[in-house]
């Protein structure tokens, strides 16, 4: 241990026991010998109790009170000082500052006059405080900071030179007119005619890792031939009812911006339509989303409805405003985001949020207003639009345009119910809005405070990440990951949509942590001078903690997405979200891998990073089977950037598919330095004809040793104790620990059973029979589906009646999900197969195929006899002569 001269006094234990301290780090000699906790408290500095010192403190306090009254002339200082939490004081004063000082020029003039009237000593104190930016950042959690820029969310940063197009005026122009375009703008690192993507965007990150767009090749998902594109067929009642059912089943539970009872009454012509153009925009957008949620991008049926919706976007539409238009424009923004029209999505969202503000949706109605249904509809629409604003701004690296919210969060109670203690489809948007609102308060405000002079310090990053995790801990119990398996299983049987909501909230939380820490390390690398890099011990420790937390958040994201894919049926909507969060997370190990290659880091860490990258590649290739073009593009980017490492000797080979000749099934394996256990996956429907069993990184255990490697009894005991379990033995947890840092396994999740409505051309227009049930996700609606054994149609309609039944209040919406059994996949062994446990959960899948807990649990006397007396396979004992 090294003696540190900076330690001024003995450790706490030595001072308490009156012992001579060696003043060593991390432990002094006495504490090390007696196994005591060694802690060095800072030396207490006591102020002198003199009249001169008290007079100086009183004068400083008086000037501070005068400054407070000049900035907040209408506030009661005594009332504010009675508040216990410093964070509450900061939030209150920041909100007051925004309300009182909307005009920045007026605020600047006021502060300039305040500075002129300041005494000379106070101005000198302000200058000294500015010069010591590092000290002020360390004391940021104890001091109250009010900033003009932070309050107004003003962004003073300029566009970097490498982001500039050739033409500074017209070079940012963009065009996304082609509805079948294969280009993804944030994968085009060329800044010309691509729009602006700022710091923190995926395009900026791709530039930093050296992605070259000239090596990128466009690739289309194999589209099924659209046999019939007759507009009358696609506009028929039977077709639109199926697509409407798909929207309400596959998308509405996760974005309940549409009031489904009103939607059904409009669809059934039970209420009058105020504007046919506005209704056609909304209705066709819903049909486009419903078609996309069934077949992804394998057909262009959804494009037909999208083009039909655009045809109604006339000049009259933008000369009016309504709730229907706000909802329709928001859904168009969501849809075009999936269809790789990022700038178009941003434009639709801009129209939507500005129109929502013009309708006053960002403010609550008077307390005397008694209709709670209307109040809740307004809140749901606003918070859906607000959450999308934050997500797009972070994704594209563009400024957040909203600075304040005076409207309450929506209620989690359905319109049919009065009170509820269980989950509803509105819990997702409530917790997402709460998470993003807290994030913008604690990160965006603090980020602009330190702007260009000093980046956010490591301590503040850790505080922000802790605040983000604290929000998730305040969520309802059924949305947290530490809920009991039994309780969660019962909830998922009644509410099958809840599983994806829980996972998506976790992914959003981890993506925000990645965003904060990634931005910190970008500034830390670019703006830190050599003098600032010579930090003290606790600063470097906090930077290391940030690095560990960043890699841990990325790894937890990959593990969580893998866990979800292993235990749930995946739809195109789920696949798109999984691929986005996977790609965002894998950029962290890629950046680390490139940094280590420049600094000649250890091969062990490189192998672990490559293993994680290959795991993501494997998952993306599985997601690509769900007809999502974005997955193919992500795979190309990863393979192009990591090609030098994947082809090197230390790289882990990419997943390959080996076919079993007996049954034609495909099994994917990863070959690497560490053995990765396989565990079964739930059968996927409507994906392909090959049953794929792929390796998951969730379980890492010892590789099984050969059954016969010696002839002694001790060797027999050793081998039998390590023998892999038979199919009749229970699945146990591997006794070895992974070589990399372990991640807390995710708790049990039942398979999420989705009521999908296939929309292939054969299914729509004849030639296929399907057995599907049809329930709408909304609690007050139900569709009646009938199966025809002799006809090709999924829905049998009457000539003189509507295809959809009238809305009916139902206490149980998902009765068809209650009777479904979760079946595990089978392990193929020649011609014999035996199913595993019928109730797979995330935890059992995570710990699958471990070694047996006992020594002879799966051993029979035949095994012992064959081991001892089978001379054909048993080699002679080398010690025996």
Swiss-Prot record:
GO molecular function (one): DNA-binding transcription activator activity, RNA polymerase II-specific
GO biological process: DNA-templated transcription; galactose metabolic process; positive regulation of transcription by RNA polymerase II; regulation of transcription from RNA polymerase II promoter by galactose
UniProt subunit comment: Binds DNA as a homodimer. Interacts directly with the mediator subunits GAL11/MED15 and SRB4/MED17.
Phosphotyrosine: residues carrying this PTM: 694
Annotated DNA-binding residue span(s): 11-38
Keywords, comma-separated and alphabetical: Activator, Carbohydrate metabolism, DNA-binding, Galactose metabolism, Metal-binding, Nucleus, Phosphoprotein, Transcription, Transcription regulation, Zinc
Motif (9aaTAD): 862-870
Entries under CDD domains matching the protein: fungal_TF_MHR, GAL4, ZIP_Gal4
GO terms under cellular component: nucleus; transcription repressor complex
SUPFAM superfamilies xrefs: Leucine zipper domain, Zn2/Cys6 DNA-binding domain
Subcellular location, record wording: Nucleus
Residues at which Zn(2+) 1 binds: 11, 14, 21, 28
Role summary: This protein is a positive regulator for the gene expression of the galactose-induced genes such as GAL1, GAL2, GAL7, GAL10, and MEL1 which code for the enzymes used to convert galactose to glucose. It recognizes a 17 base pair sequence in (5'-CGGRNNRCYNYNCNCCG-3') the upstream activating sequence (UAS-G) of these genes.
Entry PTM: Association between GAL11 and GAL4 may serve to expedite phosphorylation of GAL4.
Region named Disordered: 723-743
Domain characteristics, as noted in the entry: The 9aaTAD motif (residues 862 to 870) is a transactivation domain present in a large number of yeast and animal transcription factors.
PROSITE patterns: ZN2_CY6_FUNGAL_1 (PS00463), ZN2_CY6_FUNGAL_2 (PS50048)
UniProt modified residues of type Phosphoserine: 696, 699, 703, 712
Protein name per Swiss-Prot or TrEMBL: Regulatory protein GAL4
Binding site for Zn(2+) 2: 11, 28, 31, 38
Extra information: Present with 166 molecules/cell in log phase SD medium.
């Amino acid at each position: 241990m090294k003696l540190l001269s900076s330690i001024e006094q003995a450790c706490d234990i030595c001072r308490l026991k009156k012992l001579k301290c060696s003043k060593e780090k991390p432990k002094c000699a006495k504490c090390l010998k007696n196994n005591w906790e060694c802690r060095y408290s800072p030396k207490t500095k006591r102020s002198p109790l003199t009249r001169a010192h008290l007079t100086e403190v009183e004068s400083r306090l008086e000037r501070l009170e005068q400054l407070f009254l000049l900035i907040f002339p209408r506030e009661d200082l005594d009332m504010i000082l009675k508040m216990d939490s410093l964070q509450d004081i900061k939030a209150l004063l920041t909100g007051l500052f925004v309300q009182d000082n909307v005009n920045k020029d007026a605020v600047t003039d006021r502060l300039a006059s305040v500075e002129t009237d300041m005494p000379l000593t106070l101005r000198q104190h302000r200058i000294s405080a500015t010069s010591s930016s590092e000290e002020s950042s360390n004391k940021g959690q104890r001091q109250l900071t009010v900033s003009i820029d932070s309050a107004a969310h003003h962004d003073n940063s300029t566009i970097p030179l490498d982001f500039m197009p050739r033409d500074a005026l017209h070079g940012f122009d963009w065009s996304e007119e082609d509805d079948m375009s294969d280009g993804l703008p944030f994968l085009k690192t060329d800044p010309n005619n691509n729009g602006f993507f700022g710091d923190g965007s995926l395009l900026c990150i791709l530039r930093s890792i050296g992605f070259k767009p000239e090596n990128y090749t466009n690739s289309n998902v194999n589209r099924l031939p659209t046999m019939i594109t007759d507009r009358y067929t696609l506009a028929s009642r039977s077709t639109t009812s199926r697509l409407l059912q798909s929207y309400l089943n596959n998308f509405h539970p996760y974005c309940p911006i549409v009031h489904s009872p009103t939607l059904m009454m409009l669809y059934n012509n039970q209420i009058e339509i105020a504007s046919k153009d506005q209704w056609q925009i909304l209705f066709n957008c819903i049909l486009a989303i419903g078609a996309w949620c069934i077949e992804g991008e394998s057909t262009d049926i959804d494009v037909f409805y999208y083009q039909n919706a655009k045809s109604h976007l006339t000049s009259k539409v933008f000369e009016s405003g309504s709730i229907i238009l706000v909802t329709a424009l928001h859904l168009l923004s969501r849809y075009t985001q999936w269809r790789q029209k990022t700038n178009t999505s941003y434009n639709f969202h801009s129209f939507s949020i500005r129109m929502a503000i013009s309708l006053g949706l960002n403010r609550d109605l008077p307390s005397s207003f008694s209709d709670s249904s209307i109040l809740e509809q307004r809140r749901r629409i606003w918070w859906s639009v607000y959450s999308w604003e934050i997500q797009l701004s972070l994704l594209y690296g563009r400024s957040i345009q909203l600075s304040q919210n005076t409207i309450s969060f929506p209620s989690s109670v359905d319109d049919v119910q009065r009170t509820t203690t269980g989950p509803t489809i509105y819990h997702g948007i409530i917790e997402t809005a709460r998470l993003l609102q807290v994030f913008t308060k604690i990160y965006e405000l603090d980020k602009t405070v330190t702007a260009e002079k000093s980046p956010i310090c490591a301590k503040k990053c850790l505080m922000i990440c802790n605040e983000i995790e604290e929000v998730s801990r305040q969520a309802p119990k059924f949305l947290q990951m530490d809920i009991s398996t039994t309780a969660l299983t019962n909830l998922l049987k009644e509410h099958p949509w809840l599983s994806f909501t829980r996972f998506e909230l976790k992914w959003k939380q981890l993506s925000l942590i990645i965003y904060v820490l990634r931005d910190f390390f970008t500034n830390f690398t670019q703006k830190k001078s050599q003098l600032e890099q010579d930090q003290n011990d606790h600063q470097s420790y906090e930077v290391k903690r940030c690095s560990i937390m960043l890699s841990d958040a990325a790894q937890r994201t990959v593990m969580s997405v893998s866990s979800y894919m292993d235990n749930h049926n995946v739809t195109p909507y789920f696949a798109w979200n999984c691929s986005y969060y996977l790609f965002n997370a894998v950029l962290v190990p890629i950046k680390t891998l490139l940094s280590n290659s420049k600094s000649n880091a250890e091969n062990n860490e490189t192998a672990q990073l490559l293993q994680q990258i290959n795991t993501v590649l494997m998952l993306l290739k599985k997601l690509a089977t769900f007809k999502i073009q974005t997955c193919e593009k992500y795979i190309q980017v990863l393979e192009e950037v990591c090609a030098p490492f994947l082809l090197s000797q230390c790289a882990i080979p990419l997943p390959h598919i080996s076919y079993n000749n007996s049954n034609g099934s495909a099994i994917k394996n990863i070959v690497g330095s560490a053995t990765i256990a396989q565990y079964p996956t739930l059968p996927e429907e409507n994906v392909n004809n090959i049953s794929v069993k792929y390796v998951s990184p969730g379980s890492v255990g010892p590789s099984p040793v050969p059954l016969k490697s010696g002839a002694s009894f001790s060797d027999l005991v050793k081998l039998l104790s390590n023998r892999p379990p038979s199919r009749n033995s229970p699945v146990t947890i591997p006794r070895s620990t992974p070589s990399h840092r372990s991640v807390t396994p995710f708790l049990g999740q039942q398979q999420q059973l989705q009521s999908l409505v296939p929309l292939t051309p054969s299914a729509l227009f004849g030639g296929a029979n399907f057995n599907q049930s049809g329930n709408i996700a909304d609690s007050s609606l139900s569709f009646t589906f009938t199966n025809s054994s002799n006809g090709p149609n999924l829905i049998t309609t009457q000539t003189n009646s509507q295809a959809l039944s009238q809305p009916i209040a139902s206490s149980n919406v998902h009765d068809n999900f209650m009777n479904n059994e979760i079946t595990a996949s089978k392990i193929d062994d020649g011609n014999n197969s035996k199913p595993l446990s019928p109730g797979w959960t995330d935890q059992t899948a995570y710990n699958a195929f471990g070694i047996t807990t006992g020594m002879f649990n799966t051993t029979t006397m035949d095994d012992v006899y064959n081991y001892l007396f089978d001379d054909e396979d048993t080699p002679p004992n080398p010690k025996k002569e």
